[in-house]
Amino acid sequence: MRISSTNRRHGLLILDTGPIRELVLFHAVSEFRLENLRGELRFIKEQESYGKCSEFVASFRQMTTTSASVVVELYHWIRETERHGQNKLWRRVYEEFQNMGMDEEVVKLLEMDASFIMRFGPVDGSLLELSRRHAGRNPMILTTDLPLYGECKKSGLSVYHIDEVTLKES
């Protein structure tokens, strides 16, 4: 199945922390020359992969959302990087959100399935809740997290692992 044809059926892209982090990291290494972060790149290591991921996100035509919990995970990651690059990383997060037309939604703990939270944590729980909340918009989750990916597949939710986007044939 071609990804571009899949996007036409899915109206909303829900982004996990991993894809956002990878896009920001690649830009930080390639544009800001923060070479100390190169070793953290896992999925987007060259311009072609960055382009494919950016193109995939853009194909949702400004219909992207994430959980406020994802922003907290980004904060914890950036806080652990070298101090001199933190402002640049935050500016890049803002740019990515603006470029994606990102909406950010709060999901309350009591709105999430307790057993899922106990197994996977509140961030993944919030993404699943967003998927359920927006079921009428045919949502798709993009993640780097294999346990979340597997749970989405098992639950019948639409999900892509970032490798399915970055490694696809052009």
What are these regions (language model features)?
Residues 65, 103, 160:
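General small-molecule cofactor/ligand-binding pocket signal
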Residues 69-70, 90-125, 129:
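Acidic catalytic patch
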